[in-house]
Curated annotation (Swiss-Prot):
Annotated region described as Disordered, given as residue ranges: 132-153
Protein name: Small ribosomal subunit protein uS13
Organism of origin: Nanoarchaeum equitans (strain Kin4-M)
Assigned protein family: Belongs to the universal ribosomal protein uS13 family.
Underlying gene: rps13
GO cellular component, one term: small ribosomal subunit
Taxonomy of the source species: Archaea, Nanobdellota, Candidatus Nanoarchaeia, Nanoarchaeales, Nanoarchaeaceae
SUPFAM superfamilies linked to this entry: S13-like H2TH domain
A Gene Ontology molecular function term of the record: rRNA binding
Keywords: Ribonucleoprotein, Ribosomal protein, RNA-binding, rRNA-binding
Database matches in HAMAP family: Ribosomal_uS13 (MF_01315)
Assembly: Part of the 30S ribosomal subunit. Forms a loose heterodimer with protein S19. Forms two bridges to the 50S subunit in the 70S ribosome.
Regions of compositional bias (Basic residues) in chain numbering: 135-153
GO BP terms in the entry: translation
Keyword rRNA-binding applies: yes
């Protein structure tokens, strides 16, 4: 099966959402390098904008790149369903949000600090450096130096 021609790659490096992306790779693959964008959301953005996900990201025009970045930051404008967002029912506003880049990192950091301040179980597990989501700790999640076995005399 022959590949479809998508025109020349005009840009070697594309800058979207504070991340430098390789212009010679497909949109679908490169969007996942942006913090806060998973493969499902990348697929939804490509479908909402009507762009083929296997098209090289360097072949997009400046207008298309602006639309792509706007769709990452404001997905509700493009009809992307809210169940794909990475921050549903925000505690401060109560709205469904989608955060990308440093906004995502900072917000997650504040959420963990808030959990620790209110002394919730999740906050306690974070504070103690233990697994938060119910994993077992008998054999894994041990930190520090190992103490060897001492032979009986």
């Amino acid at each position: 099966m022959a590949k479809k021609p998508y025109g020349e790659v005009t840009k070697d490096i594309v800058h979207i959402a504070d991340v430098d992306l390789d212009g010679h790779k497909p949109i679908y693959v490169e969007l996942r390098k942006v913090v806060g964008v998973n493969w499902m959301f990348a697929h939804a953005v490509c479908a909402a904008l009507g762009i083929d996900k296997w098209r090289k990201i360097g072949s997009l025009s400046d207008e298309e790149l602006e639309k792509l970045e706007d769709a990452l930051r404001n997905p509700w404008k493009y009809g992307i369903p809210s169940w794909l967002y990475n921050r549903r029912r925000d505690p401060e506003t109560g709205k469904d949000l989608h955060l990308v880049g440093n906004d995502y990192k900072i917000t997650m950091e504040f959420d963990i600090k808030r959990e620790m301040q209110i002394n919730s179980w999740r906050g306690y597990r974070h504070r103690e450096g233990l697994p938060v989501r119910g994993q077992r700790t008998r054999s894994h999640h041990r930190k520090g130096r190992t103490v060897g076995v001492i032979k009986k005399k």
